[in-house]
Amino acid sequence: MKKIIIGNWKMNKTVSETRDFIQKFDIFYQENVGKIKEDLDFAIAPSFISLSLISKSLTKKLEIAAQNLSQFDSGAFTGEISGKMLQDLGTKYVIIGHSERREIFKEKDEELKNKILQAQKYDLIPVFCVGESLLEFEAGLTKKVIISQINAIKSVLNFQKAIIAYEPIWAIGTGKTATAAIAEKVCGLIKENFGKNTMVIYGGSVNSKNINELVSQKSIDGALVGGASLDPEEFGKILVNS
């Protein structure tokens, strides 16, 4: 199965900072393209105001990802961005169910199901995030939590055209990374329960130093990269080491 790397910028970088990133990334990519596997897919999920800038990159393999979308199709929903709008921009992937959206914005299963339906309606590939808290991990509840989170949306998700991102909450932005063995075990569990051809990636303090060990695992098909994707050279090195 092909590997994929998706950079999630969260609420970082202005438009001018995004332009600067793209210029520097393009230079790095052109200088190192021979070191990057030809079948590696990669994308960046910037803030909504910078989405269109990703398409200006000279690196034509660089795809656009969105960090979120509305559960509604169109209408009087102030501040929302629809799947149709994202499709029109050339967006390929959309992150749904990230733990920060679940915790801070209280997104529930029904809303996540509606977002998945909207994404699929407009041919966007959902990157559906699952993950357990430190308390759940230490209590040995990882399997129960992950299976439950996917079961909650499996009736609407087309697993053949989706990506499941395993992001243990205790490893997001903490500097702690699940060992490759732990990540492999959970990603393997997802494939076991929801189909061996389901694309499963890992997220949580991924960087250029640990990416190779992670993507070398049998059940890990790539990575959702947070802070390390904000630096053009570091993001480029992640691609090289994948």
From Swiss-Prot:
Gene Ontology CC terms: cytosol
Localization (cell): Cytoplasm
Segments crossing the lipid bilayer: none
InterPro entries noted in UniProt: Aldolase_TIM (IPR013785), TIM_sf (IPR035990), TrioseP_Isoase_bac/euk (IPR022896), Triosephosphate_isomerase (IPR000652), Triosephosphate_isomerase_AS (IPR020861)
Main location: cytoplasm
Record-level Gene Ontology MF annotations: triose-phosphate isomerase activity
Superkingdom to which the source organism belongs: Bacteria
EC number from the UniProt entry: 5.3.1.1
Catalytic residues identified in the record: H98 (electrophile), E167 (proton acceptor)
Pathways per UniProt: Carbohydrate biosynthesis; gluconeogenesis; Carbohydrate degradation; glycolysis; D-glyceraldehyde 3-phosphate from glycerone phosphate: step 1/1
Keywords tagged on the record: Cytoplasm, Gluconeogenesis, Glycolysis, Isomerase
Any one biological process term the GO annotation gives: glycolytic process
Entries under PROSITE patterns matching the protein: TIM_1, TIM_2
Purpose of the protein: Involved in the gluconeogenesis. Catalyzes stereospecifically the conversion of dihydroxyacetone phosphate (DHAP) to D-glyceraldehyde-3-phosphate (G3P).
NCBIfam families in UniProt: tim (TIGR00419)
Protein name: Triosephosphate isomerase
